[in-house]
Amino acid sequence: MKVLEGKRALVTLTRGMTELSRLVATTYGPNGSKVAVSKNGRVLVTTDGSALAHEVRFRDLHRLGASLVRGASTKVDRASGDGTSTTILLTGALLEAALDHYSPRTWNPVAIARDIQSYLPAVEGLLTDMSCSPDESLLERVAEMASHGDKVVSEHVVNAVIRVGENGTVLIRAGDGVGIEMDHREG
């Protein structure tokens, strides 16, 4: 059994988290790159940060750090239906910033957590100021970006979002055949 203590343990744990964050960052946004991951003889090529985060595995103690971030992103996904990549990227950035301020005498994870939480109202205010009511044109642009320019897919997504309304949920799954089907359920 390998035991690490102090800054060495913190750096090792954080490195797994930040490595996962950097990998997911390469897939992020409309210009995100494709990443290939080989696992058990099968290769996954994806621009989906969430799929990548759940498939990639690290060695040694870095694995533990990555699994902690992966778990946090899964909780966000369950609560909101999205946000896994953003959760991983923000967590990685916060951890790197916290590690820059590490000192064995002053290191206090609870104080760091409180400090981060103290910024939440300001961040929420900024996000509220930046938010806008989505019109059909904005939905089309977002859907087209998310579908990597596939107009057919983006049109179906926009139609589904408009159909379920602001508080509805759209679930997209890979089908058995070729083509796109839309199934609407009430309740």
Identify the residue ranges that each predicted region occupies.
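N-terminal glycine-/lysine-enriched basic segments
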Residues: M1-E186
